[in-house]
């Protein structure tokens, strides 16, 4: 006597359609961020396309894509120091040698002052 027939196929179809549209929005956002050089992370993608971060984390393929792009950006942002030329190394060595000599002279001067003060103190007693 139950005349209600549940038709869930349409609900399932609409849910899949919504999910597909969301995927397309996220893919467009990721592509846009790659082209324009923006930081790619879950927060920025979620804000750009108005999707929840939990949905991004739940979808494994999208999650892996964002994580790999984020890692690639981090490694590309690490800037290696330019190698010093032999000329700049020579200048640095000369500067450091000069500084060492100045410090040695100052040290010698201070040691002489200490010896003099010890002598004065000893003669006082």
UniProtKB/Swiss-Prot annotation:
Question: A single GO BP annotation from the record?
Answer: DNA recombination
What's this protein's name?
Transposase C from transposon PsiTn554
Q: Which UniProt keywords apply?
A: DNA recombination, DNA-binding, Transposable element, Transposition
State the Gene Ontology terms under molecular function: DNA binding
Record carries keyword DNA-binding? yes
Q: According to the UniProt record, which cysteines are disulfide-bonded?
A: none
Concerning InterPro entries, the annotation shows: TnpC-like
